[in-house]
Amino acid sequence: MKKIMSTNPKTPELIQKLKEESFKNSAPIWKDVAKKLAKPARKKVEVNVSKISRYASEGDVLLIPGKVLGAGSLKVNVTVAAFSFSETAKSAIEAVGGKCLTIEELIAENPKGSKVTIMA
């Protein structure tokens, strides 16, 4: 097994938890997210609020295996789970009635990962 190197000590722990949950709940979505989080920092996902607004519908549950940035505006009420959020992104999502979750909170809420869309 490949050793995961990261300057953020939270990353390898989260990747391990995602793999365990994928196996335990027969949910391949968590394994896919773990692979995306294991990428080098220069290839990590960064999604702006404007992209969420462009592609999401009202009430969607989105999973971003990276960081959510605050550029743009949001017009739909969505639940967004991500590795991290910028302060402006968090306030923009919550301003329209959406929820910001960590990936761990999403796993606790929805262990099977049903009706979750990965946005990368």
Curated annotation (Swiss-Prot):
GO MF term set: RNA binding; structural constituent of ribosome
GO process terms (BP): translation
Database matches in PANTHER family: 60S RIBOSOMAL PROTEIN L18, LARGE RIBOSOMAL SUBUNIT PROTEIN EL18
Keywords: Ribonucleoprotein, Ribosomal protein
Family: Belongs to the eukaryotic ribosomal protein eL18 family.
This protein's name: Large ribosomal subunit protein eL18
Keyword Ribonucleoprotein: yes
KW tRNA processing (keyword) present: no
GO cellular component, one term: cytosolic large ribosomal subunit
Transmembrane segments: none
